[in-house]
Amino acid sequence: MNKKILFIPLIAFMALAVIFATQLVRNQSGDDPTKLESVLIGKEVPEFRLEDLAEPGKLYDQAVFKGEPLLLNVWATWCPTCYAEHSYLNKLAAQGVKIIGLNYKDDRNKAVGWLNELGNPYLISLFDGNGMLGLDLGVYGAPETFLIDANGVVRYRHVGDVNPTNWASTLEPMYQDLLEEAK
């Protein structure tokens, strides 16, 4: 009986080793767990009515995403990565990149103060205090950035910060393609 008990930890260790090895093989075969697909790719931004971050009572709906290609950047003051990407978003906006901000599950006063202090790269800042639009978009956390075409259709989802590397390699070429399509 005692010998059988000694095998239980060995069996548990072997099971964990198999699970670990399986995950390593999955990651090597291209199944990247950091890539979060969106069911909204190819679909219009979901319907919503949200207030402007700085002007409570001023409402916007999904029509703000129609007319020209743009980025929808999901951000919050509680998000350290959002802080890290913010100066780069300011640079992109200064270069003419159209960006709408979605302030996600945040304190409105802190968010307004953040933009006043760090600069505001957003054409419009939507306030999603309860996270309902974020939920409809499938947001897991902040930051996330969506490429939206001129018809209000989600074309790409980027999880994590927008930085010079991923902007140049992935996001900018896609954004430029959307600008060409819109002509």
Named regions from a protein language model:
Residues 44, 68-70, 74-78, 141:
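Short pre-active-site segment immediately N-terminal to redox-active cysteine/selenocysteine motifs
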Residues 46-49, 75, 100, 135:
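Conserved Rossmann-like nucleotide-binding pocket used by diverse enzymes
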Residues 48-70:
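A short beta-strand-turn-helix
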Residues 83-119, 129-136:
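Structural microenvironment flanking redox-active thiols in thiol-disulfide oxidoreductases
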Residues 1-51:
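N-terminal targeting signals for export/organelle localization
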Residues 29-31, 51-58, 125-128:
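Short gly/ser/thr-rich secondary-structure transition/capping motifs
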Residues 116-121, 128-179:
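Thiol/disulfide oxidoreductase modules built on the thioredoxin-like
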Residues 71-72, 99, 145:
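Hydrophobic beta-strand anchors of alpha/beta hydrolase catalytic cores
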